[in-house]
């Protein structure tokens, strides 16, 4: 950000008017308020709220199970990988690992991938990228994961669900 002359401010903010934002700053990556307030004047404002991974309660703790941050730190490419969630971040990870040689399945409980963007844009993306994945299971939920020595066995429910658990390396 500094190389592009962008100031990053972390905290809780509210707009005072169309060109001013008051921010109550927080410490580091935590949400603890420092008490310091800053008023920022701008012509154009980008709000990058970030995201946090959802940890599903039925998924066991296992080093082969990672969130999107952990997926960026893998030292080797798994042979077969499941991506839970067909949103932008999940599909970004799926595309990266497919390009690196992993066989990828994507499971999404909604009826389409990427719920936020324009549907026509998503269709273009799907047409250009669907070949990268072994399976895209829509209207399907992950309902169980069993971590065994030889792999992760995943159970699904829904329209695109396989009848038996499927084995994944990650």
Each model region followed by its residue ranges:
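Generic detector of short alpha-helix boundary/capping microenvironments
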Residues: 1, 33-34, 82, 160
